[in-house]
Amino acid sequence: MLRTMLKSKIHRATVTQADLHYVGSVTVDQDLLDAADLLPGEQVAIVDVTNGARLETYVIPGRRGSGVIGINGAAAHLVHPGDLVILIAYGQLEDAQARGYQPRIVHVDSGNRIVDLNADAATAAPGTAGAPVPNPLADSLA
């Protein structure tokens, strides 16, 4: 049986540009692609932390060291410069391999510079997490 598992994640990157008229895809600094083990053309999900939008596209390499995260094509209607995003890639692994697999997790700062690598996928790197969103139903659940 194959399991679809988290393979790569670039956490809380800042969108630096958007080009509605580009053919499509997301442009990502080559340093971030290398750190996250993402290849040009690889499918990624983009989760917009700022507005909740989710979409799928593929990556194209951007200039190394530039910090570029560029949203291209129709996705520019959903994701805008300055938005915080999470880029996620999944892989299919055999059950035994999946049980021991460690994904590549890349935490970045506001300039999209790497601040932490291969941390626990469920733990934010120091200084990268925002304030928790309050649960509006918390009082009624108590």
From Swiss-Prot:
Co-factor binding comment: Binds 1 pyruvoyl group covalently per subunit.
Family stated for the protein in its record: Belongs to the PanD family.
PTM field: Is synthesized initially as an inactive proenzyme, which is activated by self-cleavage at a specific serine bond to produce a beta-subunit with a hydroxyl group at its C-terminus and an alpha-subunit with a pyruvoyl group at its N-terminus.
Quaternary structure note: Heterooctamer of four alpha and four beta subunits.
Modification Pyruvic acid (Ser) occurs at: 25
Broad enzyme group: lyase
Catalytic reactions of this protein: L-aspartate + H(+) = beta-alanine + CO2
This protein's name: Aspartate 1-decarboxylase
Any single GO BP term: pantothenate biosynthetic process
